[in-house]
A protein has these predicted regions:
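Short, structured active-site "lid" loops
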Residues: 19-42
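Patatin-like phospholipase
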Residues: 2, 29-30, 123-124
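Short, well-ordered secondary-structure micro-motifs
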Residues: 15-18, 48-49, 91
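Mid-chain, well-packed structural core segment of small domains
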Residues: 38-39, 44-84
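A short beta-strand-loop structural module common to alpha/beta enzyme folds
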Residues: 2-14
Length: 124
């Protein structure tokens, strides 16, 4: 199993998603969390917030295939879901696919290394 830290909202009222996205993304960036899962209406805002943090590779996934590919090819460490577009059953399948899929490495590692180099250069 895995340890779960719920850093989400506690109600139905509208909130500022960056305030919540930063909690998970900062945890992944610092190494405190191995992975994170974020949800907002479209998923776009949370993905933008999370990808501001060094070492975070957030992927907005709307289906199981993109969830698997984001892990296999990109070693994504933050999954972002679109709450308005994803029903609970589909969300469960996406999360399961994402959690169970390993990074393939190989040619994909070379590409990740290039992304890390770019990130180091730009985040000084």
């Amino acid at each position: 199993g895995c340890r779960l830290v719920d850093a989400g909202t506690r109600g139905e009222e509208s909130v500022d998603y960056p305030d919540f996205g930063v909690l998970a993304a900062e945890g992944v960036s610092s190494g405190r969390f191995e992975r994170g899962i974020l949800v907002c209406g479209s998923g776009v805002g949370m993905a933008i917030v999370a990808n501001k943090f060094p070492g975070v590779r957030a992927a907005l996934c709307l289906d199981e295939e993109t969830a698997r590919l984001s892990r296999q090819h990109n070693d994504s460490n933050v999954l972002v879901l679109a709450g308005r577009k994803t029903d609970p059953d589909t969300a469960g399948r996406i999360v399961r696919a994402w959690l169970e899929t390993p990074f393939e490495g190989g040619r994909h590692q070379k590409r990740l290394d290039k992304i890390r180099e770019l990130e180091q250069r730009l985040c000084k």
